[in-house]
Amino acid sequence: MKLQLIAVGTKMPDWIQAGFTDYLRRFPKDMPFDLIEIPAGKRGKNADIKRILEKEGEQMLAAVSKGSRIVTLDIPGSRWETPQLAQQLEHWKRDGRDVSLLIGGPEGLAPACKAAAEQSWSLSPLTLPHPLVRVLVAESLYRAWSITTNHPYHRE
């Protein structure tokens, strides 16, 4: 199983890049984790936000690996505690398909992305900065993996 994080936005702050890359390097070779960045549409005073969202959504869905399970990161999604996320990760591994996790831009995810998703995951009821979500997802999935393999990273 391969994990893909497909996120709107490029040119992240150094601390985001460093945090995300740190967790990315920790993943085992049998569970590669790739980041695909989708350029954010230009937002200005007279921008057509609906059209920008549609275009970002089209690009995100085009980046999804064929046959991949799509999981959106969205406030109304399922809230998993760490042991539940570990169970989800095990379920995804048994399923055998790749998993594509989608993080939207400033206005969230396009309706097409939400419609294509098999699951939606909520990290928090809070609105989080989208760059920070990258680091939180990577850490959470690494922690879940550590539970499934009895790695000492996670402690109860």
From Swiss-Prot:
GO molecular function: rRNA (pseudouridine-N3-)-methyltransferase activity
Subcellular location: Cytoplasm
SUPFAM superfamilies: alpha/beta knot
Database matches in InterPro entries: Alpha/beta_knot_MTases, RlmH-like, tRNA_m1G_MTases_N
EC number(s) reported in the record: 2.1.1.177
Pfam families: SPOUT_MTase
Keyword S-adenosyl-L-methionine carried by entry: yes
Cellular component terms per the entry's GO annotation: cytoplasm
Catalyzed reactions: pseudouridine(1915) in 23S rRNA + S-adenosyl-L-methionine = N(3)-methylpseudouridine(1915) in 23S rRNA + S-adenosyl-L-homocysteine + H(+)
Record keywords: Cytoplasm, Methyltransferase, rRNA processing, S-adenosyl-L-methionine, Transferase
Binding residues annotated for S-adenosyl-L-methionine, in chain numbering: L73, G104, L123, S124, P125, L126, T127, L128
Taxonomic superkingdom: Bacteria
Record's function text: Specifically methylates the pseudouridine at position 1915 (m3Psi1915) in 23S rRNA.
Classification via NCBIfam families: PRK00103.1-1, PRK00103.1-4, tRNA_RlmH_YbeA
Family: Belongs to the RNA methyltransferase RlmH family.
Description of how the protein assembles with itself and partners: Homodimer.
Name by which UniProt lists this protein: Ribosomal RNA large subunit methyltransferase H
Annotated source species: Photorhabdus laumondii subsp. laumondii (strain DSM 15139 / CIP 105565 / TT01)
Name of the encoding gene: rlmH
